[in-house]
Amino acid sequence: MKTFLILALLAIVATTATSAVRVPVPQLQPQNPSQQQPQEQVPLMQQQQQFPGQQEQFPPQQPYPHQQPFPSQQPYPQPQPFPPQLPYPQTQPFPPQQPYPQPQPQYPQPQQPISQQQAQQQQQQQQTLQQILQQQLIPCRDVVLQQHNIAHASSQVLQQSSYQQLQQLCCQQLFQIPEQSRCQAIHNVVHAIILHHHQQQQQQPSSQVSYQQPQEQYPSGQVSFQSSQQNPQAQGSVQPQQLPQFQEIRNLALQTLPAMCNVYIPPYCSTTIAPFGIFGTN
């Protein structure tokens, strides 16, 4: 009986051993049928399963190729503004610099005939101012003469309308005279009044001199003066006996004309005496 039990146990152990050996064989064959040692491949698969788990840490290195910003460097060649430098040679204004040496020879030319030009200018001033005295300053002479007649209570007084016309004509002529020549013009007006009085004294030798109205006419601003052309003493200097009369009439003219016409008369006009018919700049 013992032997029978031992044999039965051995049979059971053998069957269990064969069943245990046969069970893993069909599991390993479908995975790798070509390999004859399936037991050695099991740890390899386990190792391969562990490596991909460990190798999955490397994918975070993939964003490095995404950081390539090299195409953004392409706009740098785009802002090249070299073509706008082309207009600089077009705007070269070098030819206008050529006229600068041209006026240089002109500077010594006006410096040479300075004395001749001054002489010519003085002659022209004398001629023009003498013409002004003969024609244009007659209204100023008559205005001052009217004030002189009023101051001396003369019966010969102009009408208001004709006196206003004389004032307008006188102021128009004074504005046309240069400022440096107005003093000489005032002196010539005073000389003309003195000559006018001298003519009246010659025509009326009596002690009482009556002032006659001037015979000049002023149609449309045109002035005609005949007494200065007929008088041979049109040019001359103030005589010593005429000096008080000259100073009186000059003061009257300097009080009347500048205020009436609102023009500037140099202050030295009240102290200097200019010869009649001679003009210049002081």
Curated annotation (Swiss-Prot):
It comes from the Eukaryota. Residues 1-20 form the signal peptide. Substrate of transglutaminase. Residues 224-240 have a biased composition (Polar residues). The keyword Nucleus does not apply. Keywords: Allergen, Repeat, Seed storage protein, Signal, Storage protein. The alpha/beta-gliadins can be divided into 5 homology classes. Sequence divergence between the classes is due to single base substitutions and to duplications or deletions within or near direct repeats. There are more than a 100 copies of the gene for alpha/beta-gliadin per haploid genome. Belongs to the gliadin/glutenin family. This is Alpha/beta-gliadin A-III. It comes from Triticum aestivum (Wheat).
